[in-house]
């Protein structure tokens, strides 16, 4: 479970249920709502670009601009999708994914999206809270009904969806393959241990 930078763990997550299911809870640096992310059940991507790319745009306009290529790929897969301001990718059946963004001091914009490929409704209902109340106590059906996973909509394997997204981005913007260097990986691990994996960061009061 990934909560937004300005959210409270107590309000968003039922920690006993998270521990029972083995769900790790982390806090990201971007805003937005809690995201239930499981390996194999989501498709995520991040864009890190010079802030000049979105200069002069409102936040709402920049969200739509940075994810326009995704909508094109999903439409090519036969989905009727659109951008629901501020940050949702939506279809006729419900929400597919959501975006979050942060402008960083180094003159860059970090923009990332999580899309639902499949969803474990029972686990979601036990772990996620809304307004401090466990979702299952309010009725998980209404929330799951608003989520329309890519697996149900496309009938495609997750890797096929990912390959189509990579191809679509490359066709529009170009791609150069690269790898994370050992220094970059080491620095990332330092940031995790020094900040992002600490109880102080997770349970901070925004």
Q: What role is predicted for each listed range?
A:
Residues 1-57:
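N-terminal lobe of the biotin/lipoate ligase/transferase fold
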Residues 12-13, 54-59, 123-125, 157-160:
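Short, conserved charged micro-motifs
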Residues 37, 58, 62, 153-157:
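Short alpha-helix boundary/capping segments
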Residues 39, 92-93, 105, 119:
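Short acidic-glycine loop/turn motifs at beta-strand connectors
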Residues 40-92:
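Contiguous, small/hydrophobic- and glycine-enriched helical/loop subdomains that border
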Residues 67-80, 102-206:
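Long, positively charged amphipathic alpha-helical accessory segments at protein N-termini or as interdomain linkers
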Residues 89-101:
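A short beta-strand motif that forms the metal-chelation/ATP-contact edge
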